[in-house]
Structure formats: structure tokens, C-alpha cells
Amino acid sequence: VADRTAICPGTFDPPTLGHIDVIRRAATMFDHVVVAVVRAPQHKMQPVFTADERIALLEDGLADLDNVRVRSFTTLIVDVAREEGATVLVKGLRAVSDFEWEFQMAHLNAELAPELETAFVMSYPDWSFVSSSGVREVAAFGGDVSKYVTPRVARELAAKFPQPSES
């Protein structure tokens, strides 16, 4: 049986414990998992973290997994999947609202690359409400995000959003 490679694409700005959980679960299902960080998201505002910072944050949170590698991309994800020899695209789903968008993308990717399957991994209830945008918002106002991200991500978010001292 040939090795099976999956690709987990995303913006990961910042990576949350929900992202880490989905990637860890994918790592138990596939021989190799490539986490693909989009360099310049087309549909989002300017990322808080650079692509290289997001890669480093993911590598830190996944350092104990020998079968996971993190890289960036600037092309179609189906082209990255072909380049990596991936046969499955793994996407995490938190709620029905995620499904609507991911369902459309899965069909579009199937048109572009019929050989690439999309597999949805349901988030655990602990992470179903956690989003990168929500974490950024809490961090921007000085809130505690330590329950939602790794310690390194929490530190780096605090550095990105220094809080003015009250006088």
C-alpha cells in the first residue's frame, strides 16, 4: 500500500487549538500531512502574522509529530496537493456555517482536480466556537486567549497587540 498524504490548507492567522486538533487527528489517519499556509489570503484583510510567522507558530504547536510538515503556498491548493502527492484535502468544520463555504470549495476543487478528495473533520465541542478572527479580536482588546491557542501564540499575540497602560 502506498503512503497516503493529506494536505490541510488554511490561513491560520493565528493558528488556534482547534486547528492544531484537526491537524493532529489528520496525522493519525494519514502517513504524511502537509499543512499549507496561504501567503496572501485573497478574501481576508491583511494578516496579523506574516506567513513565515504563522509557519513557525504551527511548527511549534506540532513539533512532536514526525509525519507533519508545514509550508506556505501562493497558488491554487489543488496545484499544491499535486506537487506534494496529496490525495486528500482535510478541512475542519466547526458548524453548519463552515459547511456552506467548505462544501462550495470542495465542489470547485473536485472540478479542478477530480483525483483529490475532500475530507471534513468535525471539531470537538471544546473548539466549535473558536475562530482565528475571534481570537484576534479578544487579543486586540487585551483579553486572555490562553484557552484557545498555544502558549507561544498567546505570547506573540500579546506582543502584536500591546495594551496601553491605564492612567
Enumerate the language-model features and the residues they cover:
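Nucleotidyltransferase catalytic core that binds NTPs
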Residues: 1-167
